[in-house]
UniProtKB/Swiss-Prot annotation:
<dbReference type="InterPro" id="IPR011012">
    <property type="entry name" value="Longin-like_dom_sf"/>
</dbReference>
<dbReference type="GO" id="GO:0006888">
    <property type="term" value="P:endoplasmic reticulum to Golgi vesicle-mediated transport"/>
</dbReference>
<keyword id="KW-0333">Golgi apparatus</keyword>
<dbReference type="GO" id="GO:0006901">
    <property type="term" value="P:vesicle coating"/>
</dbReference>
<keyword id="KW-0256">Endoplasmic reticulum</keyword>
<keyword id="KW-0813">Transport</keyword>
<comment type="subunit">
    <text>Part of the multisubunit transport protein particle (TRAPP) complex. The heterodimer TRAPPC6B-TRAPPC3 interacts with TRAPPC1 likely providing a core for TRAPP complex formation.</text>
</comment>
<comment type="similarity">
    <text>Belongs to the TRAPP small subunits family. BET5 subfamily.</text>
</comment>
<dbReference type="GO" id="GO:0099022">
    <property type="term" value="P:vesicle tethering"/>
</dbReference>
<dbReference type="GO" id="GO:1990071">
    <property type="term" value="C:TRAPPII protein complex"/>
</dbReference>
<dbReference type="GO" id="GO:0048208">
    <property type="term" value="P:COPII vesicle coating"/>
</dbReference>
<dbReference type="GO" id="GO:1990072">
    <property type="term" value="C:TRAPPIII protein complex"/>
</dbReference>
<protein>
    <recommendedName>
        <fullName>Trafficking protein particle complex subunit 1</fullName>
    </recommendedName>
</protein>
<dbReference type="Pfam" id="PF04099">
    <property type="entry name" value="Sybindin"/>
</dbReference>
<dbReference type="GO" id="GO:0030008">
    <property type="term" value="C:TRAPP complex"/>
</dbReference>
<dbReference type="GO" id="GO:0005737">
    <property type="term" value="C:cytoplasm"/>
</dbReference>
<keyword id="KW-0931">ER-Golgi transport</keyword>
Length: 145
């Protein structure tokens, strides 16, 4: 099992942070364009799920998968979206995404007066702690197999 990448978006679609670990294929477009496409897809899926679900879904959608990867999604009450792409063998990781938001983003970005909110995260401490945390996950593989 492995982690491919992670996105953090604000409620306006600004990509606050992007990290990559075992991404085998690049999108072939500029990163800014990739971020816009990812956010647009998330917005559309979220809207579709809320309209089509026969039940009142308090959490909306949590993940979806293709034949190649699984996208895990977590949205906070403030509209921050945490998105992690993994291989298909990874089960539900809502608690992992919540931890990334609450214990890393809030602690090292939101509570840091030197980190302006609504802009790309510049904190090296956040980046290094995020990288260490993701690498410590049981489904993170040192080899992209």
């Amino acid at each position: 099992m492995t982690v491919h990448n992670l996105y953090l978006f604000d409620r306006n679609g600004v990509c606050l942070h992007y990290s990559e670990w075992h991404r085998k294929k690049q999108a072939g477009i500029p990163k800014e364009e990739e971020y816009k496409l990812m956010y647009g897809m998330l917005f559309s899926i979220r809207s579709f799920v809320s309209k089509m679900s026969p039940l009142d879904m308090k959490d909306g959608f949590l993940s979806f998968q293709t034949s190649r990867y699984k996208l895990h999604y977590y949205e906070t009450p403030t509209g921050i979206k945490v998105v992690m792409n993994t291989d298909l063998g990874v089960g539900p990781i809502r608690d992992v995404l919540h931890h990334i938001y609450s214990a890393l983003y809030v602690e090292f970005v939101v509570k840091n007066p030197l980190c302006p909110l609504g802009q790309t995260v510049q904190s090296e401490l956040f980046r290094s702690r995020l990288d260490s945390y993701v690498r410590s996950l049981p489904f993170f593989s040192a080899r992209a197999g």
